[in-house]
Regions:
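Catalytic alpha/beta active-site cores
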Residues: 1-143
């Protein structure tokens, strides 16, 4: 593959710092991996999550077994806005359009048997982003 098209001379509107770094090096204007998609395909992921953590875990494992290389976690509405599943305002919404996550135990079950250091994960999160990210990081640390 011809990579000369992306040299600083070929892209004059970029600053030297933006255009001169090779792929995989700061400032990552040419990608985060040294060979990018020539050596590693993009992540294949399906937006999924429903019911409880165990049901969603079964779905994620199935998707990975079928060739998926990443996960896109769909959280239910109560989780996205910060309500526990037993909160009165969550009634009728728990697990309907995504997985219900109320605790670190739920997050551990969600990713049980899935090596987070081997699978890229995206999460559609709103106001509770910092809480769910903290639970995700704690789960990853528990896995080692």
């Amino acid at each position: 593959m011809n990579t000369k098209n992306f040299s600083p001379e070929a892209v004059p509107r970029c600053t030297p710092a933006e255009a001169s770094a090779p792929p995989g090096q700061f400032p990552f204007t040419r990608g985060i991996h040294p060979t990018m998609y020539r050596g590693r395909l993009w992540s294949m992921r399906q937006y999924a999550g429903f019911g409880n953590a165990a049901e969603s875990n079964r779905r994620y494992r199935y998707l990975l077994e079928q060739g998926g290389s990443g996960l896109s976690v769909a959280f239910d509405l109560p989780t996205q806005i910060g309500y526990d599943s037993d909160h009165p305002l969550a009634r009728g919404e728990v697990g309907r359009v995504g997985v219900a996550i109320d605790s670190i135990e739920d997050m551990n079950v969600l990713f049980e048997g899935i090596r987070l250091d081997k699978v890229s994960t995206s999460m559609t999160i709103n106001a509770t982003a910092i809480i769910l990210l903290a639970l995700y990081v704690a789960t990853a640390r528990k896995q080692g």
